[in-house]
Amino acid sequence: MRVPGPLRPFLAALVAPLLFVPGPLRSDTGASKTAPGKEPIRWRSIASGNSEAKRSGKPALYFFTAAWCGPCRLLEGQVFAVPEMAAQIERDFVPIEVADRARETGRNSPEMLALADRYGLRGFPTLVVSRPGLAENLMLEGWQGREKALEFLKTAKKRFLGLEKKPR
């Protein structure tokens, strides 16, 4: 079908945003929605995730994100939505979503603000890996591409898994 010349820009404006729909989409609860048969990441709240990290000794993977953050959707779609990566993250880390809700609710939770201050958050997305009892943490700021994110997770796994706890 041939589209008449004057309608082409209008049609392109309608279709172009559909090409960049991020995945996975999120529900109001923050749970990832993925296609059937795929293993989504079960993001924990700050409180339950911190508790689980302390109990299990696994490093916490903090995902600082916001609903309005386009680069956050790229990270979700190109890294977190990949079934193998989701399974690896669930196995090696305690994934904790730290969502900025200031635009939606007018404020952020005290827990979110405390973590943002603790790690010197400067923007979204930001990944921080920290293990309870260790003074050290690793941080990846901004969307730097799929390969950089995968490299970051691999480095964090090597650095934090199997380490003895050092007092803070």
Indicate residue ranges for each PLM-predicted region:
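Bacterial N-terminal signal peptides that target proteins for export
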Residues: 2-11
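Thiol-based oxidoreductase modules, predominantly thioredoxin-like and allied folds used
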Residues: 43, 85-109
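Short active-site neighborhood of thiol/selenol oxidoreductases, capturing the structured segment around
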Residues: 56-67
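Typically the conserved alpha-helix immediately C-terminal to a functionally engaged Cys/Sec
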Residues: 73-88
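Non-catalytic, surface beta->alpha helical segment in thiol-disulfide oxidoreductase systems
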Residues: 122-162
